[in-house]
Structure formats: structure tokens, C-alpha cells
Amino acid sequence: MSKRDFYEVLGVDKTADEKTLKSAYRKQAMKYHPDRNPGDAEAEAQFKVVGEAYSVLSDPNKRAAYDRMGHAAFEQGGGMGGGQGPFGGGGGAADFADIFEQVFGEAFNMGGGGGRRGGRGQAGPARGSDLRFDMEISLEDAFNGKDETIKVPTAMNCERCDGQGNEPGTELETCGTCQGAGRIRRSQGFFTMEQTCPQCGGRGQYVKTPCNDCDGVGRVRKTRTLNVTVPAGVEDGTRIRLAGEGEAGARGGPRGDLYIFISVREHEIFERDGPNLYCRTPASMVQAALGCTIQVPTIEGGKAEMKIAEGAQTGKRMRMRGKGMPRLRGGPRGDMIVELFVETPRNLCDRQKELLKEFCDLSGEGCNPDSAGFFNKVKQFWDEVTTDDGRPNAG
């Protein structure tokens, strides 16, 4: 007896993506589930065929083999190895239970980092998934702290059925295969093995009349609006945990958590290193030579006075204590380190040039000790590598 085409079994075309396959399997599995069709051998057989089709088409390798060779890929001598079958060896009810659990138990298990707790195949409540939200703020926001309103797409308990999955006014049905235990025992020779119930996926109950709003899942996708307080002192990469603000749990389980990941934008003036701030400030050649008091910007938005000593050079660093960032866990503020760079005058008029030349003529080595020392070293170097007549010294 020839087998039906797996794509035909699920009612999809050969270009169907993973989402389409899962939706089609879910629809067919609910339709032919044995607990919905008690005593119907034909429905039970079709339920297994649907599971077999999905197990092949949802696996990229098996699907590729099936597309090339059809059902022959899983028969004796086929491309998947002699006699393996689409389930890779074991086969049977446990594999259908795995598929059923994967599709129905994790229908809303998206994103975040938590996932469900308690393990597959266990009846009862399951914790919702954790969620991640990325928030970009300015350096000023990191200094002052801020309150932000965010919108987070998440799975929430269906209001119509209160997260139970069944249409209001109907009851969850006890699984007839495991009698509500969620697990069954099978004997193989001298051994007795316990496994997840293949009919209810380990829940012990099943939804006979699905809720019209959530289609029996118990959760729906919605966008939540939350108020988030970003504390002063947060750094780039800081993670803020909002307990219980993640995905809704399954079957009355607790919600997961929401994690806010902070990203601090680069600033035009300041660079940050932990609690300390760095900025570069210009000074004229005259200011640097004679010394002066200049005004430098602060992260608060104001200005602070800083004294420049006489003869300051480019690269000189000066520390302003307590003018940096607040610390997230308390304690004194960091410092602001100001780095000086001396500007060389440009676009000089003739008179300015004359004055600079006059200044240069009056300057002695004492005015430019670094330059004098450098040129003395150069002269000494040339004396060592050349002869008296200017030729390179062979020695």
C-alpha cells in the first residue's frame, strides 16, 4: 500500500517554511487527536501519519532526503540508512509525544534567555520565558538617571480563558491513555519503562473545546507598556532586571523576567572610563605660556574654572575631583580629567608675524628647554656619525 505524500498529508506546498509547517501540523494533530476521537482507529492512524509527516518535513536533512527520494529515503537501503525510518531508529509513540510537546508546549516560547522551567513532559504550571529589551540612552541620562516608557511585545495569558486554553463554560478533559498522570509505563521483556504520555504530551489533560481567542494555547501575543527607571550611574552594558515582567507562564505558571540592556551613546565632548570622565580643552599659545584660568564644560551642563600653570604643554592632564560620574552602587563621584592641547595661531597678519619673529629673536634656550635639548642631541649624533669634512664616519 503506497503512502500519501507528506506535503499532502499536512496540506502544504513544497515551499512551505517552518512556521507554515508547524501551523499545519498543529491543525491536523488537533483534528485527529485520539482523545478527540475515542475509539476511532482511522483517526488514530491518521494522527500518527500526521506526526510522521511533520517529523520529516520539520528536519532540514530529512526533508532534503525526502525531496530527493520520497518515502524510499527511509526504507531499507534508503538514503537515511538501512531501516532507520523517519524517526532515526526508535520510532513509536514516544517520538509522536516529543513532536506534540514541542509544537504545543512551546508555541509561545520565544526570545529572552529563560525558557520554560520544570522539564518537558511534566504536567502542571511552567514558568514563562525571560525577555530582553535593548535601550539606548545619552551620557547625560546615565549621569542623571531617567524614567522611560517602553513597549514590549510579549506573550500574555488569554483573558477569555484565563490562560487555560479551553473555551469558557467547558472543562479540560482528563487524558484517557494515562488517566491524568501524564506518563505511562510500557513493558519490554524484563524491563518496565516509563515515558511521556503520547496522547496528552505529559499534561494529563487536553483541551477538547479550544478557546476562540487563543485557539487552545492559553496565551496571546500583545504589546505591553512598561515604565522603567534607569538609575544614575549606569554604564554601557548594564543589565536591569524587572522580575515578573517577562512572558506569561503556561498553565498558570509564573511569568518570566524582563532584562533591560543599556547602551550609552558616545558623547561629543566627554569620554567615559568607569566613574571618570575625560575631555580635551584648547588653550592659546599665550595662555599656555603665561598661565591663566580657563572655563571647562561639566557633565551637569555648566562650566567650571580650571587654573593652567605657566608654561603648560600639549598633553598636560589636570584632575578635577568629584566632577565625574556618579557610582551605580553609591559612593563618591568620579573625577574629570582635562587634557590640554595648545593651539598654534593661524591666519596671522603682518604685524603679528613681526612680533612673533621679534619674540623668537629674543628667546634664548631657557625659554624652550625641550627644543634646545633636542637640537643638542641631534648635533651630538651627527658629530658621532660624520668626519670633520662632513663625510659619513666609516668607523
Swiss-Prot record:
Binding site for Zn(2+) 1: 158, 161, 211, 214
Example GO BP: chaperone cofactor-dependent protein refolding
GO cellular component, one term: cytoplasm
InterPro entries, per the entry: DnaJ, DnaJ_C, DnaJ_domain, DnaJ_domain_CS, HSP40/DnaJ_pept-bd, HSP_DnaJ_Cys-rich_dom, HSP_DnaJ_Cys-rich_dom_sf, J_dom_sf
Binding positions (Zn(2+) 2): 175, 178, 197, 200
UniProt repeat feature CXXCXGXG motif, residue ranges: 158-165, 175-182, 197-204, 211-218
Cofactor: Zn(2+)
Zn-finger region bounds: CR-type: 145-223
Residue span(s) of domain J: 5-70
Matches recorded under PROSITE patterns: DNAJ_1, DNAJ_2, ZF_CR
Cofactor note: Binds 2 Zn(2+) ions per monomer.
Top-level division of the source organism's lineage: Bacteria
Record CDD domains: DnaJ, DnaJ_C, DnaJ_zf
GO-annotated molecular function: ATP binding; heat shock protein binding; unfolded protein binding; zinc ion binding
Key word Chaperone present: yes
Keyword Repeat: yes
Subcellular location: Cytoplasm
Domain notes: The J domain is necessary and sufficient to stimulate DnaK ATPase activity. Zinc center 1 plays an important role in the autonomous, DnaK-independent chaperone activity of DnaJ. Zinc center 2 is essential for interaction with DnaK and for DnaJ activity.
Family membership noted in the UniProt record: Belongs to the DnaJ family.
Free-text function comment from the UniProt entry: Participates actively in the response to hyperosmotic and heat shock by preventing the aggregation of stress-denatured proteins and by disaggregating proteins, also in an autonomous, DnaK-independent fashion. Unfolded proteins bind initially to DnaJ; upon interaction with the DnaJ-bound protein, DnaK hydrolyzes its bound ATP, resulting in the formation of a stable complex. GrpE releases ADP from DnaK; ATP binding to DnaK triggers the release of the substrate protein, thus completing the reaction cycle.
Assembly behavior: Homodimer.
Protein name (record): Chaperone protein DnaJ
Species of origin: Maricaulis maris (strain MCS10)
Gene name linked to the record: dnaJ
